[in-house]
């Protein structure tokens, strides 16, 4: 799928979700929407920094755990045992850390545009929400996921998308 086709698909999805949220019986009052728009850049900046810090901390923790497992196995073999400790840090763990880092970068990139009330910033939040949703579905198929994780991801994504689309009209598109 090329870049233009992907963009077309995302725009179509955005339009459908916007209509779906607008058709819901409960809409946020305009005053609440304006308050969210006012604080959104700062919330996004905080979450972006926190996400990058968490990704780094988890990456470092995973590396330390891997080294500890290797050391435990080496010591076990030296004293006549077998390597009994097994690292359970699969591709899913590393993928989760990478997704967290990418989301953090998206949030940081969104900050200036959100502050200027540009739709490009809103788009980055939308892409981050979609990335989180896709990651939640992928996690269904490994040891760290499961149906409970999928349900939590779907619920969190639905709530996040609801608020995101409630404020969508407050962001202006770039002039062509």
Could you tell me what each predicted segment is?
Residues 2-176:
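Topology signature of small-to-medium multi-pass alpha-helical membrane proteins
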